[in-house]
Swiss-Prot record:
Keywords: Chloroplast, Plastid. InterPro entries: Ycf54, Ycf54-like_sf. Its main location: plastid. This is Uncharacterized protein ycf54. Pfam families: Ycf54. It is found in: Plastid, Chloroplast. Gene3D superfamilies: Uncharacterised protein family Ycf54. The lineage of its organism: Eukaryota, Rhodophyta, Bangiophyceae, Bangiales, Bangiaceae. It comes from Pyropia yezoensis. GO terms for cellular component: chloroplast. PANTHER family: PTHR35319, YCF54.
Length: 111
């Protein structure tokens, strides 16, 4: 089992009000320059909120929740400090999230 850490908020807050694109762009550039694999994902309407042990988190956010999931607890804690009004937590699962399993291609060319 893998421990996943998450930051959770409404889609409006994270995707419209906060500069999340800038945060992700900086983080991806940092990972690429240090030859690190991406270990965070943006998940709209995360299904892990349906687990019984997640009911307290589910009740804190509207139905249009979005989660940032990572295997790196330091990144999630940093997001909490940077963004502020988000919930953070963790769960264990057999998910094997990776760029390959999610069919993600990271573009390296500047547009």
């Amino acid at each position: 089992m893998t421990t996943y850490y998450f930051a959770l908020a409404s889609q409006n807050f994270l995707l419209v009000q906060e500069p999340l694109e800038e945060v992700f762009r900086e983080r991806v550039n940092y990972y690429q320059s240090n030859n690190k694999a991406i270990d965070f994902w943006l998940i709209p309407n995360p299904s892990f909120l349906e687990k019984p042990e997640m009911i307290s988190f589910k009740n804190l956010v509207p139905k249009d929740a979005v989660a940032i999931i990572s295997t790196n607890p330091i990144f999630i804690n940093w997001l909490k400090l940077r963004i502020g009004y988000i919930c953070i937590g963790q769960f264990e699962d057999n998910l094997q999230l990776s760029e390959e399993s999610l069919n993600i291609t990271v573009l390296t060319d500047k547009i």
